[in-house]
């Protein structure tokens, strides 16, 4: 029905209408066709590219979300993961995880510390005390300087 009138469609037209209604917008994370290029974070943390051949390595990268058609997006992810590992190591070397985590406030352009209740579990590194979290902010700032990056270059 369209505007109250019944419209007869051929099977081909019906299929086209169904495809138009259910078509999914492609994202950078969709699986590529054979021989199309995608980007991934290599063992050394560097973003590399390869053509999808349908090999086991392609399946593994796609399955664990290490597969993206947008190089810039993957570079940001690689930088984010590197910073997160640096902060995780710092946390482990300084008392381990805890109720404190650090965050960057884009609105004010500065870092903050947030304390969470013990029953809240966060993704990413946490810190055992406010003092250690303050030191972690300095570690993060140093990492940004050493890599000639700003928080806006890394965080999504």
Where are each of the predicted segments found?
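Structural boundary micro-motifs
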Residues: 1-156
